[in-house]
Amino acid sequence: MSKQLTAQAPVEPIVLGKMGSSYGIRGWLRVFSSTEDAESIFDYQPWFIQKAGQWQQVQLESWKHHNQDLIIKLKGVDDRDSANLLTNCEIVVDSSQLPALEDGSYYWKDLMGCQVVTTEGYDLGKVVDMMETGSNDVIVIKANLKDAFGIKERLVPFLDGQVIKKVDLATRTIEVDWDPGF
């Protein structure tokens, strides 16, 4: 398979996808992309996987569409048994490969862990997840243990200007115009 590269492990790892089940007998694998455009995952190289706590760099040899799936062939993975060993491995790159964003645009990874407060100063909790819906993204906020409204989790639409009033990544805070009772 591929050689282990400890010196070239990702400094700031970010998961862009996951390897699925093997396809055929020649080492092809299904791949599930988390990028906005599924094929964009192939723009980011090199890929890393983590096996037994060690980073390994894997080289993409080829990829193609098969029905609704994307399938990949990795260098050195030439049979079904080798491919099966990679099933469910996350595809990781160094976040320095991601392009710079315009003002007002954010990578989900940068919003994770941010404290969310209302425009009135009520502390809603911390961002623990993001969801993509048909119309807009939604931030999942884990409420503080002693939340006055007894809410454990809040779903707040990420609508810049309407709901999201200010994002300050330096202080890790997001200000929202949102009723704490929701």
Curated annotation (Swiss-Prot):
Q: Name the UniProt key words of this record, in alphabetical order.
A: Chaperone, Cytoplasm, Ribosome biogenesis, rRNA processing
- Gene3D superfamilies assigned: PRC-barrel domain, RimM
Q: Which GO terms describe its cellular component?
A: cytoplasm; ribosome
Pfam families with a match to the protein in the record: PRC_RimM (PF24986), RimM (PF01782)
Q: Which residues form the PRC barrel domain?
A: 103-182
Where in or outside the cell it occurs: the entry states: Cytoplasm
Q: Which GO terms describe its biological process?
A: ribosomal small subunit biogenesis; rRNA processing
Where is it chiefly localized? cytoplasm
Q: Which InterPro entries match?
A: PRC_barrel-like_sf, PRC_RimM, RimM, RimM_N, RimM_N_sf, Transl_B-barrel_sf
- The region annotated as signal peptide is none
Q: What's a single GO MF annotation on this record?
A: ribosome binding
Q: Assembly and partners?
A: Binds ribosomal protein uS19.
Annotated family:
Belongs to the RimM family.
Described function: An accessory protein needed during the final step in the assembly of 30S ribosomal subunit, possibly for assembly of the head region. Essential for efficient processing of 16S rRNA. May be needed both before and after RbfA during the maturation of 16S rRNA. It has affinity for free ribosomal 30S subunits but not for 70S ribosomes.
PANTHER family found in the cross-reference section: RIBOSOME MATURATION FACTOR RIMM (PTHR33692:SF1)
Q: What is known of its domains?
A: The PRC barrel domain binds ribosomal protein uS19.
Looking up HAMAP family in the UniProt record yields: Ribosome_mat_RimM
Please identify the protein, giving its name as recorded: Ribosome maturation factor RimM
Q: Which organism is it from?
A: Citrobacter koseri (strain ATCC BAA-895 / CDC 4225-83 / SGSC4696)
Q: Supply the source organism's classification.
A: Bacteria, Pseudomonadati, Pseudomonadota, Gammaproteobacteria, Enterobacterales
